[in-house]
Amino acid sequence: PYDVAAPDVNAALQETGLTMLGLNTRRGNVANGDNGLSAIPERVEEARDAIDEAVNYAAAIKAQCIHVMAGFASGPEAHKTFTANLKYACDAALIHGIKILIEPLNHYDAPGYFLTTTEQAGNLIKEVKAVNLALMFDCYHVQLMEGDLSHRLAELMPVIGHIQFASVPDRGTPDHGEINFEHIFSIISELGYSAPVGAEYKPVGPTIDTLGWMSKYI
């Protein structure tokens, strides 16, 4: 949202009665292929500038969460860098009551991305030991990388900070594809998750025309 001034976002939120759930750190130079910065050893200064910007912006619009994007990297130095940057982000966000999220991305859509599995994310959360660090569980990515969504949700619920969904394999509306979302939403409710869930799919046409799937849930 960084191209829009925070006061303008606040005005839109007040007008619609909505709250801002979260935002991402800047991805970097997208034209050069960046998809996050925080696990790239030689770009720590840029990563922390992006974290500072995200924290300040999130605080200004009262956003609840920030997704710190790792970027394309691998190996022990990348792990060390990402861990240090997550600690930095958690410390900066904590004073504003903001939660930091990490999200595994599938290696079909984002080959070379540092964070790809829920196991890796869970281990990072244990290592960082920050009260405001949590997992963004995207059903689309987890299904493509691991499957077994019901058990993954049950196992990881204590560290889940946000849930997103889209159909697999086309990342469309959740009324088709290989995931039974009626079952998944029931599991999420049974596990005691009461926060909002995010429909992060690719609409075919105007988004407003693709919301028919919601009728059975509202």
Describe these PLM feature segments.
Residues D3-L21, D52-A59, T83-L94, D148-E155:
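Short amphipathic alpha-helices and their capping/turn segments at secondary-structure boundaries
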Residues Y2-A5, R26-N29, A70-S74, P104-Y108, ...:
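Active-site-proximal loop/turn and secondary-structure-junction residues that shape catalytic pockets
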Residues E53, K62-A63, K87-Y88, K99, ...:
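Histidine-acidic metal/acid-base catalytic patches
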Residues A6-A11, H79, T207-T210:
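Metal-dependent catalytic neighborhoods of phosphoester/phosphodiester hydrolases
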